[in-house]
């Protein structure tokens, strides 16, 4: 379906608010433009860790820039009243992404979120220990989307004031740990409706 038609139909379907996260400068600007076009859509602005990938991959863009400079270039976007969060940002050790650069970039986002008093949209793939350490250090509020950790860790994260997102990976046959975490969390501590619901569980659009 056409994205514009889908977004326009959301209020009638009972969806009150949507937050569209950016993953780089271009998509962050697009998210702000989309938020300005629909009263029930808001934007988040940030740089996804996969943007730092050094080699061509079929599912990610290749980053050849300076993330700190790009984050500074995004500064005017955070002044827009339609921008309600920082992100998507985080750590991803599944792809060949430089770890030092990822950590530095995530800390830059977390410091910015604290300065702006905005929540963050966090990405954590195969980087639980480092992510949890930064949560302890910066104490952000927001959501950790597409959660894949243990039930014990999920309870701790929720106790820090961070919502947990559970995406399409919950349907995987080997996702017992994730399903257990979901079952042991009180709602509305758990919620996720980002692109990963479709992206990581490819099927038909109607599904």
Can you describe what each PLM-predicted range is?
Residues 1-207:
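Mid-domain alpha/beta scaffold segments of enzyme catalytic cores
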């Amino acid at each position: 379906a056409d994205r514009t038609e889908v977004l326009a139909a959301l209020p009638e379907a009972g969806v009150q608010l949507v937050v569209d996260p950016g993953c780089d400068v271009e998509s962050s600007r697009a998210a702000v433009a989309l938020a300005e076009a629909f009263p029930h859509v808001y934007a988040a602005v940030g740089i996804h860790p996969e943007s730092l990938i050094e080699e061509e991959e079929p599912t990610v863009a290749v980053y050849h820039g300076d993330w700190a400079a790009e984050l500074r270039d995004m500064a005017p976007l955070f002044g827009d009243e339609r921008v309600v969060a920082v992100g998507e940002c985080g750590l991803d050790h599944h792809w060949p992404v430089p770890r030092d650069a990822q950590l530095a970039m995530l800390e830059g986002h977390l410091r910015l979120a604290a300065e702006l008093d905005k929540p963050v949209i966090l990405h954590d793939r195969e980087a639980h220990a480092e992510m949890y350490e930064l949560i302890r250090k910066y104490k952000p509020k927001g959501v950790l989307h597409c959660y894949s950790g243990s039930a014990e860790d999920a309870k701790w994260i929720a106790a820090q004031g961070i919502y947990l997102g559970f995406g399409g990976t919950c349907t995987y046959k080997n996702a017992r740990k994730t399903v257990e975490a979901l079952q042991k969390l009180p709602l509305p501590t758990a919620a996720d409706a980002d692109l990963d619901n479709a992206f990581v569980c490819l099927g038909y659009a109607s599904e």
